[in-house]
From Swiss-Prot:
CDD domains: aTrm56-like (cd18083). It comes from Methanosarcina mazei (strain ATCC BAA-159 / DSM 3647 / Goe1 / Go1 / JCM 11833 / OCM 88). Its main location: cytoplasm. Its EC number is 2.1.1.206. InterPro entries: Alpha/beta_knot_MTases, tRNA_m1G_MTases_N, tRNA_mtfrase_aTrm56. This is tRNA (cytidine(56)-2'-O)-methyltransferase. One of its GO terms (biological process) is tRNA nucleoside ribose methylation. SUPFAM superfamilies: alpha/beta knot. NCBIfam families: PRK03958.1.
């Protein structure tokens, strides 16, 4: 089974709470096992842990990590690092290679990314050549490299489950799961 973890760089607690939360939610929904936050924001941790508690799965978040140390540890453990931006090799040209990777760290920045990221990454991947959202970059990339259909992923241990319906909201509360 493919292991994917997201490394979030440049999060500014006063400005990026919502977008960083959405980056984590998107990564979780599309199959990442966790998110490493290279900043200190316990509110993000609390929000994502609450989602996992209510909606299930085993997604984790580590707060205030050293991005250099996390990348080093990941690579020493046999993993590869994919940095998403507007610059680099076009995603469609690398998607097949990324799909073959069993252990992948996806790096996504907020503000200006430290220049060494471009050297530390195994791949610098352009998700389009126009300004875009980090959420979009994560969603497009993870969908392109997914095993199976990521939108059909099940999340064990959920307190709540959405039942597909043509109209309206149908949410069930799972007893003791």
């Amino acid at each position: 089974m493919k292991r994917i973890v997201l490394l979030r760089l440049g999060h500014r607690p006063e400005r990026d709470k919502r977008i960083t939360t959405h980056v984590g939610l998107t990564a979780r929904m599309l199959g990442a096992e966790g998110m490493l936050l290279a900043s200190d924001d316990s509110g993000i941790v609390q929000s994502l842990e609450d989602v996992v508690r209510r909606w299930g799965g085993n997604f984790y978040i580590k707060n205030n990590v050293s991005f250099k140390q996390e990348i080093r540890n990941w690579k020493e453990g046999g993993g590869k690092v994919c940095h998403l931006s507007m610059y680099g090799v076009n995603l469609p040209d690398l998607a097949d290679e990324l799909k073959k990777c069993d252990k992948l760290m996806i790096v996504v920045g907020a503000e200006k990314v430290p220049p060494e990221i471009y050297q530390l990454a195994d791949w610098n991947v352009a998700v389009g050549s126009q300004p875009h959202s980090e959420v979009a970059a994560v969603a497009i990339t993870m969908d392109r490299i997914a095993e199976g259909e990521p939108l059909e992923k099940e999340f064990p241990g959920a307190e709540l489950t959405i039942v597909p319906a043509e109209r309206g909201k149908h949410v069930i509360e799972n007893a003791g799961e």
